[in-house]
Amino acid sequence: PWVKENADAFLVQWYAGEEQGNSAADILLGNVNPSGKLNVSFPRSTGNTPCYYNYLPTDKEYYDNLGGSPDSPAARYIFEKPYALWNFGYGLSYSDFNYVSCELGASEYDSANGVIRAEVEVENVSDRDGKEVVQLYIRDLLSSVATPIKQLKAFKKVLVPAHGKVKVSLEVPVDELSLYNERMQRVVEPGDFEIQIGSSSDCIQFRDTVSVR
C-alpha cells in the first residue's frame, strides 16, 4: 500500500477530542514521545477483512498457498497474502528498545490456583527516555476444541530511561487459560502452553513452554 511505501510513520489518533490538534502537534514536534500500541490489526485492503491476530488454526494452508487472480479467481476472494499491514499491538516510538532476557517463575503450574509469572528485562538503546508496552501472549498447544493461535493475556507499559534497563513483571492466573469444552463447561484443560513475550503480536522476542497439571 502507498502509505507504508511512502511514509516513515503513520499517526493514529482515533477520537482524540477537542485537544486532538495540540496532541498531534506535540507528537510531530517531538515534545512528547509516543508509546501507544494498536488495539486492532490494520488490513492491507478492504479485500483482506476480517483481519485479526487471534484467528483459529486451519488445515487449509490459507496463508501460504494462495491461488487465484482477478482474471482467474479459483476458490479465492483474496489475491494476496492476507497478512496485516500493521499488526495488533504494534506501535512506534522515538526510542528504540531491545528485549534482553525473559525468565519464567516455573515450568509447571497447578490448574486450581496457579499463577504464571514472567520477568522481562527491556533496554532502551536510544538517547531519549521512552515508554515500552511489554506484551505476553499464550497459545494452547493442544486442546479439545479449536482455540486461537495466540491470545494477549498480560501487558505492562514501563518507562525506560535512555541507555537504561528495566525489569518488567507480568502475571497470568492459570484460570485465564480456561475454555468452553464441547459440553459448554468452562474448564482449564491440562497440557502444554506456549508463552510468547514481545512488543506486538507479530514481533515475539521470547518463547517458552509451560505445563498445567
Regions found by a protein language model. Give the residues of each.
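Secreted, periplasmic, or luminal enzymes acting at the cell surface/secretory milieu
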Residues: W2-K131, Y137, P190, E194-G198, ...
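Residue-level signal for secondary-structure boundary sites
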Residues: S107, R128, S144, E176-S178, ...
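Intrinsic-disorder/low-complexity, polar/charged segments enriched in Ser/Thr/Lys/Arg/Asp/Glu/Gln
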Residues: V115-R117, K165-S169, Q205-R207
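Short acidic, flexible loop segments centered on an aromatic residue
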Residues: D127-S144, K150-L152
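Hydrophobic alpha-helical segments
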Residues: S143, V158, Q196-S200
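Intrinsically disordered, low-complexity Pro/Gly/Ser/Thr-rich segments with frequent PxxP/GP/PP motifs
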Residues: S144-Y180, M184
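Terminal connector regions
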Residues: P173-R213
